[in-house]
A protein has these predicted regions:
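N-terminal leader/signal peptides at the extreme start of proteins
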Residues: 1-35
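N-terminal cationic amphipathic segment used for targeting or macromolecule association
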Residues: 9, 20-24, 43, 181, ...
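N-terminal single-pass transmembrane signal-anchor helix
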Residues: 31-62
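Short, contiguous strand/loop micro-motifs
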Residues: 34, 67-68
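Residues in the signature-helix immediately C-terminal to the ABC NBD "C-loop/LSGGQ" signature motif
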Residues: 42, 56, 68, 72-75
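Regular, well-ordered alpha-helical segments
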Residues: 52, 60-63, 67, 79, ...
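Short, well-structured segments within or immediately adjacent to enzyme catalytic domains
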Residues: 71-293
Length: 293
């Protein structure tokens, strides 16, 4: 007797189509309506209005963040200033390279300094070489080679204010001068030939400036009478104070604190004053020069 095997009918049920075909047909039969020109213009107008409202706020927030970062960096340089003096028997770092005993314009050759018999150079006690190692940063002398100079101007470098804008000609490797958007108070050493940390601390450290926002070429000024030449040098004071943060700038003081100040509270702006564009004297909240006993 022959046994008949059951077979499964694999034929497609009548009236059913594959899912993909069904969807395709539905899409062909369906109706869709795009945006009309008027609706599109309305959307664009709304987005433009939102941009006008948001962009100024975002820009202000960014500038505020840069100001806070600059303040933090200046405060760190103040700490490094103290650490260096403590490690060197109270002797403070110099604000500029001055081979003749007077503040001069610092070029890359002076950053490198003159060789000494022990294999070092005589520029290692200038603040831009002496203090960076205190913060695990690279001394400026390491940027003196032509191939490395462009890296010096990177505003991520702690030696610069992150909001600084350097003139284009300064960014050429052949430009002979490093520009500093932060500077050490140029009046400290000029107060006397051997100013020490103890002398500063014995005076009025809470008002004595150590570091400041330094004016660069092309940046806004507190007053037109401020200096216009030799800007961006590593030593500066009121006449080169840079108000790049909302009409003001940052200062770091000898007691370790730092703060933002309006430009007119740092620079003399009274017309007719012989000090216009320079420091405010007698000093109120800000002292540049040390009073020796």
């Amino acid at each position: 007797m022959k046994i008949r095997q059951n077979t499964v009918d694999r034929a497609r049920p009548v009236g059913l189509r594959p899912f993909s075909l069904a969807v395709s047909g539905a899409l062909r039969k369906g109706t869709s309506r795009g945006l009309t020109l008027i609706e599109l213009l309305i959307v664009v107008a709304v987005l433009g209005l939102l941009a006008l409202l948001l962009f100024p706020s975002l820009a202000r927030a960014r500038q505020k963040a840069l100001q806070v970062e600059c303040l933090s960096r200046l405060r760190q340089w103040g700490i490094a200033f103290d650490h260096y003096a403590e490690d060197n028997n109270g002797r403070i770092a110099r604000e500029c390279y001055e081979p003749l005993g007077e503040v001069t314009i610092n070029n890359w050759s002076q950053v490198k300094g003159r060789p000494r018999p022990d294999g070092t150079t005589d520029s290692l006690d200038v603040w831009y070489n002496a203090l960076p190692p205190e913060l695990n940063q690279v001394a400026t002398i390491r940027y003196a080679a032509l191939a490395d100079r462009i890296r010096f101007f990177d505003t991520r470098n702690l030696i610069h204010c992150p909001a600084a804008r350097f003139p284009k000609h300064a960014l050429r490797p052949t430009y002979q001068f490093p520009l500093f958007s932060m500077a050490m108070n140029s009046q400290l050493i000029q107060s006397g030939p051997s100013i020490r940390l103890s002398t500063i601390e014995a005076g009025d450290p809470a008002r004595t400036v150590l570091f400041l926002d330094n004016l660069l070429e092309g940046e806004p000024r507190v007053h037109p009478a401020q200096e216009r030449t030799h800007l961006g040098q590593p030593g500066a004071y009121a006449n080169r104070f840079g108000p790049r943060h909302d009409d003001g700038g940052n200062l770091a003081f000898a007691d370790g604190h730092a703060g933002w100040f309006r430009g007119r509270d740092v620079v003399q702006t009274e017309e007719g004053s012989p000090l216009v564009g320079g420091p405010i004297l007698p000093p109120r909240d800000i002292v540049w020069e040390i009073s020796l006993p």
